[in-house]
C-alpha cells in the first residue's frame, strides 16, 4: 500500500490489509507511510513491516538527522510487535525534488537509518543522475552488504559509549571481533569524539577502521577520532 494515509480513511485501508495478510500469510505486507501515518497508527499499522517515505531532498534545508529520528520513531511504534523497519530513502527523484543527495548525504543517511534500527533500504525513484551520487550508492551498498552479518548479529555485547550527541553509533560482536559503526549525523559540524569501549575490548591496542585503510590507537579502552560532517567510521577490534 502506497502513501494512503494522505488520501484514504484508516477504517477503509485496515480491512484491505487484513485481506492480503489472510490471502498470503507468508508474503510480507507493508504500507509505505508518511510521518503522519505511523505515529497516528493509520490502519492500526496492520502490516508485517513498517515503512516510511520521507525524503531528504523533497524541500530545502532538510537534514540527515531527520531521517535518523524518523527511523527511531518507526522502531518505537513497532517494537511491541517486533515489526521490522524499512526506509524508502531519497535517490534520484528530480521530477519533483529540487536536487539529488550529495555523496556525503547518501552515505550518511544510509548508515544513519541502519544505526537507528532500519533493516531494509530502498531508494526512490531511480538510478542517480549525478556521478558523485551514483558513486555513493555503489559504495554504501557494497559496505552495508559487507557488514550484513555484523548488523544482524545477535551475539550479546555491551555497547560502546560516545558522549557527543551528534555521534550516532551501533556496537556489534561477531565471533572474536567487536564492531563499532559510528556516524557524525550533523550536516555542518565536525566532531572530535571519544569512544569508550566495553570491557571485552579492554586489552585492545588498536582498531582497524574498515573501508579506510587505516588504524587508530586504543588507549585506556578509548578511541579518539575525528569526524567530518556526515562522516562514518567502522571500527573493528580483535577480542
Predicted features by range, described:
Residues 1-11, 34-40, 44-58:
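Active-site groove signature of glycoside hydrolases
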Residues 32-42, 65-76, 104-109, 165-166:
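Alpha-helical scaffolding within the catalytic cores
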Residues 73-104:
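Active-site clefts of carbohydrate-active enzymes
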Residues 104-134:
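Substrate-binding cleft of secreted/luminal carbohydrate-active enzymes
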Residues 129-177:
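Glycan-recognition and catalytic regions of carbohydrate-active enzymes
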Residues 163-201, 230:
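Carbohydrate-binding surface patches
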Residues 196-213:
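Solvent-exposed beta-hairpin/edge-strand motifs
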Residues 218-239:
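C-terminal beta-strand-rich structural cap/linker in extracellular carbohydrate-active enzymes
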